[in-house]
Swiss-Prot record:
GO CC annotation, single: mitochondrial membrane
Keyword Translocase carried by entry: yes
Enzyme Commission code(s) on record: 7.1.1.2
Family membership: Belongs to the complex I subunit 3 family.
Gene name tied to this protein: ND3
Chief place of localization: mitochondrion
Name of this chain's protein: NADH-ubiquinone oxidoreductase chain 3
Role this protein plays: Core subunit of the mitochondrial membrane respiratory chain NADH dehydrogenase (Complex I) that is believed to belong to the minimal assembly required for catalysis. Complex I functions in the transfer of electrons from NADH to the respiratory chain. The immediate electron acceptor for the enzyme is believed to be ubiquinone.
Organism, scientific name: Allomyces macrogynus
GO molecular function terms noted in the UniProt entry: NADH dehydrogenase (ubiquinone) activity
Annotated Pfam families: Oxidored_q4
């Protein structure tokens, strides 16, 4: 019952704050608000340039290997209590990630030339 009260209170508070924000806001977009701004100067070129796909690829690779650390960290903190099966699962996980990294390196996905 207590959780239901908290859930209802949270929903009512959230909807109430959104309504108050919507009713009190003064949306008046003008040319200055929607124009590009670069350190107080007018932009020299198109301010909305597209990024090269390789930047996104590097970002995705970073996220993948960052998640690897998240998955390995609990194993490293309790390594003395891990069974033989848990150790083999971790080794297989690391081997798969290493093979993936080698494939990315060989295929040219990781280069310094952007």
């Amino acid at each position: 019952m207590t959780y239901l009260v908290y859930i209802v209170f949270t929903i009512v508070l959230t909807v109430g704050l959104i309504l108050v924000s919507y009713l009190l806001s003064q949306a008046q977009p003008d040319s200055e608000k929607v124009s590009a701004y670069e350190c107080g100067f007018s932009p020299l070129g198109d301010a909305r340039q597209k990024f090269d796909v390789s930047f996104y690829l590097i970002a995705i690779l970073f996220i993948i290997f960052d998640l690897e650390v998240v998955f390995i960290l609990p194993f490293a903190s309790v390594i003395h209590n891990v069974s033989l099966l848990g150790g083999w699962i971790t080794i297989i996980f690391l081997v798969i990630l290493t093979i993936g990294f080698i494939y990315e390196f060989v295929s040219g996905a990781i280069t310094d030339s952007f």
